[in-house]
Regions:
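Edge beta-strand at a domain terminus
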Residues: 74-93, 122-146
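N-terminal glycine/threonine-rich, aromatic-flanked beta-hairpin/loop signature
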Residues: 44-85
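An anionic, turn-rich surface loop/hairpin at beta-sheet edges
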Residues: 91-117
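Short, hydrophobic/aromatic-rich segments at coil-to-beta transitions
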Residues: 25-36, 56-61, 89-97, 123-126
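Bacterial Sec-dependent N-terminal signal peptides
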Residues: 3-5, 10, 14-37, 133-146
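Short, cysteine-centered beta-strand-loop-beta hairpins and adjacent loop/turn segments enriched
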Residues: 40-43, 66-76, 101-108, 134
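Short, solvent-exposed loop/hinge segments that bridge or flank secondary-structure elements
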Residues: 26-58, 104-109
Length: 146
């Protein structure tokens, strides 16, 4: 009986140890956009707002502001005629000088957008973007604070 009890306790301890070693990565939600071979995404992570910009298969992520209201709509920042626009005017404080410049200096005037799901830790993020349940691609990169 003692052997069975010892075995059961060892099994429970090993299961608990295994589950406690799993990476605890907060999920994030946002939107990814595509235009002329350049992709970018906006997302929130622990009340901070980031933009991830991908050009030529290289990605940088940059902090651009903070969420100031729990009732705010999900962040949505996009470029139109070279100007950042979106619904992040209420419930967010976006630092305009922190918004990235376009790699080629051309304005985005048309885009495709997809919802994203993923995770972040203190230095990097990884998320996939999808439409109608089909994964369209993956962003994965370091957070760069300029």
């Amino acid at each position: 009986m003692k052997k069975i009890l010892f075995f059961a306790l060892a099994l429970v301890a090993s299961v608990l140890a295994f589950t406690s070693c799993e990476k605890n990565e907060p999920e994030l939600k946002g939107t990814v956009y595509h235009y002329r071979g350049i992709s970018w995404a906006d997302f929130e992570y622990e009340h901070d707002v980031y933009i991830a910009l991908e050009d030529n298969h290289k990605m940088t992520m940059k902090w651009v502001g903070v969420k100031t209201s729990e009732d705010a709509e999900p962040v949505n920042l996009y470029l139109y005629d070279g100007i950042w626009e979106g619904n992040a005017t209420e419930g967010y404080h976006i630092h305009c000088d922190a918004l990235p410049q376009l790699p080629d200096g051309k304005p985005f005037d048309k885009w495709e957008s997809f919802d994203i799901d993923g995770w972040c830790d203190a230095t990097s993020c990884s998320f996939d973007y999808h439409i109608n349940g089909s994964t369209m691609g993956i962003f994965d990169g370091e957070i760069v604070n300029d």
